[in-house]
Structures are given as C-alpha cells and as structure tokens.
C-alpha cells in the first residue's frame, strides 16, 4: 500500500512519510516520488511547492478510510475493500433497503455500485443516502447503444439517485468496446457528460475477456468491472494485474461467483491478495451485510486452511459453468419502464 492509503486508513502517523522517502532510490525525481507516495496531482504540487505540513493539512481534510484501503487507479477514489453491490436490493422494499444501506454507510462502506438496468436500485440508493452524498462514491451504468439512449439513461439515473453527478459512469456489458469515432457516439457522450460535470470518471463493465483486455489496452477507461473470484482462470486473474500496470481501477463483481462460493472469508482473503482490487458484495439481507462489515476491522487473510479450501473448490467448481449472473436471460423492460414513469 502507498503511504497515502496507510495514512488515510490510520495505519501510520504522518511522520512515517520520512521513512518512505528514505527508501526512495531516485531522490532527484520528486514527481515520481510523489506518485510512489500515492499523491494526486494537487497534493503533489502542494507537497513539492510548499511543505510537508501543507500536505498533511490537505490529507487531513479528507475523510478517513475504515479498514483496508484500495485506490481505484488514477481516480483518487480511496475506499475500503467492501463495496456495496446494489443489484439484490431490487428484491426488497424501499424501507428494508434503506436499513441495509444506512447500516453499511454507518459501518464505513463508502462505495455503492448500481445500474439503470437494476429496476429501482438507483431510487433506493437515492432514498437512503442522498443526505450523505458528499461522503460516498456512486458507480452506476448504462446499457444504451446510442447517444440518445445514453443521455436518457444518465438523466434518469441522476434523478433517481437524487444527485447532480455520478462518480463512475460505466458502459454496462457492451458487446463491443466503445471508442471515439466508432460511429455509435457513446464514448463522445461520455466525454461530454464529464465536461458538463455530470460524471467524474469513465468505466466499463463486461463478462467477455476480449473486450476487457481491449478496454485496458485502449487507455480510454478509468475503471474496469469484471467477474473476479478464486474460481477465476489465470487469464482472468491477469486482468487485475494488467489494470495495476495501466493504473486503471479494477472493480471485482461476482466475488462469490453467483452463490457458488459459500465461504465469504475465503472469498475476501483471495480478493485481499490484490491491492488494486475493489470487490463489491451483493447484499440483500442484514446478516449478509453483518458478515462483510465484520471484515472491515477483522479482514480475513490467506491461511493454509483457506488455501486448501480454495484449491478444493477450484477442482470441484472451476471451468465453464453458470455463475448465476443472469445476463444471458431474456429481458423484459416493462418493470424498468414502470419505474421510469414514476
């Protein structure tokens, strides 16, 4: 972890910066040293042009991170390794969803992932968390295939979430990797939305290796969201490493492989091996949330026992099989449209 991650999570005092600097073997390169410390551009300028004290004051103005911190690539979004996956809250009432979302927030969860496709999930997040909007990060998605559809989805999402901006706006499992000049107008719409301040960062989600790899190599995206768990293939695991090399945030969906993985501690321990990976856990019941909340202060680590369990599960379950994501199912937009007209 970087000095900044450790400091914001309360694991080291500010004075520890001197030890980090002393380990640096390229003392003539302050900009690269600042990157090594985990500083963003503004913090880098303050530190280089002013003083350690000015940097400390700047960092102290940020909210502390509960638990193990992870930085999403170049976004400077730093949260703990417990993202809230809001797909399952479609299945519960608004008031039950509010109980879950507020409990997660009160425990230190700060990253919430949803989608326009998830019927009323966005509305429930807006209902439960609009009063703490400035203290959380919201990622949502559009499955639009045209620029017109993109803008309709974005405006609907902003309305439902009760916000005027989204932290990460993601293309939702597109059949091709959107790029400038591809004729769809989608990536251009992303850039315009960012220019207007309606989104902060551009992301993409997918289930196809080829598109995920293309998105990483393109350099066009701030984050990639992809299925990632201890049943993943070596090629899939390599995506997380490639994102780290390209300074791209990696958001791990299906961390429990659609319910095939039943030991959440083992699932967390696997994800924790990758410092750049932010797992999002799909939560529908309070007891499920309690389990993941407990990992904020007591994160499971890889042990011989967990390693043996993972190895056994990989022998039994790994391969080409249904991970329960539902993406191949026929889609009815009746329910979605009903919520859009509320």
Which role fits each region the language model picked out?
Residues 65-136:
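N-terminal binding-site loop/beta-alpha segment at the start of enzyme catalytic domains
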Residues 161-177:
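Active-site groove signature of glycoside hydrolases
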Residues 126-133, 158-163, 216, 241:
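Acidic (Asp/Glu)-rich catalytic clusters
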Residues 83, 113, 167-170, 203, ...:
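Conserved beta-strand positions in the central sheet of alpha/beta enzyme cores
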Residues 66, 174-333:
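Beta/alpha (TIM)-barrel catalytic core signal, keyed to glycine-rich beta->alpha loops juxtaposed to Asp/Glu
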Residues 93-103, 148-160, 207-214, 264-267:
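Short, acidic/polar
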């Amino acid at each position: 972890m970087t000095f900044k991650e450790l400091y914001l999570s309360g694991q080291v005092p500010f004075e520890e910066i001197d030890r980090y600097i002393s380990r640096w073997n390229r003392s003539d390169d302050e900009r690269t040293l600042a990157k090594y410390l985990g500083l963003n551009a503004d913090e880098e300028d303050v530190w280089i042009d002013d003083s350690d004290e000015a940097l400390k004051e700047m960092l102290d103005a940020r909210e502390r991170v509960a638990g193990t911190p992870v930085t999403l690539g170049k976004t400077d979004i730093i949260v703990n390794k417990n993202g809230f996956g809001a797909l399952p809250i479609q299945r519960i009432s608004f008031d039950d969803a509010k109980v879950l979302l507020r409990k997660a927030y009160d425990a230190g969860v700060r990253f919430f992932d949803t989608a326009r496709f998830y019927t009323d999930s966005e509305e429930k997040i807006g209902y439960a968390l609009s009063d703490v909007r400035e203290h959380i990060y919201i990622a949502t998605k559009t499955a639009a295939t045209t620029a017109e559809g993109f803008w309709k989805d974005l405006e609907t999402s902003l309305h439902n979430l009760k916000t005027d901006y989204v932290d990460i706006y993601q293309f939702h499992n597109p059949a091709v990797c959107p790029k400038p000049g591809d004729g769809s107008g989608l990536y251009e719409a992303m850039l315009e939305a960012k220019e207007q301040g309606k989104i902060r960062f551009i992301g993409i989600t997918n289930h196809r290796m080829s598109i995920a790899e293309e998105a990483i190599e393109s350099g066009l995206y701030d984050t990639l969201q992809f299925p990632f768990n201890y049943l993943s293939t070596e090629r899939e695991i390599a995506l997380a490493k490639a994102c780290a090399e390209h300074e791209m945030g990696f958001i791990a969906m299906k961390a429990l492989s659609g319910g095939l993985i039943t030991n959440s501690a083992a699932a967390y321990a696997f994800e924790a091996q990758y410092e750049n990976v932010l797992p999002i856990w799909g939560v529908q019941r309070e007891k499920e949330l309690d389990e993941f909340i407990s990992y904020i202060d007591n994160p499971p680590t890889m042990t011989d026992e967990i390693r043996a369990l993972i190895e056994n599960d990989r022998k039994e379950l790994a391969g080409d099989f249904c991970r329960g994501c539902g993406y191949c199912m026929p889609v009815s937009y009746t329910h979605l449209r009903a919520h859009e007209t509320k």
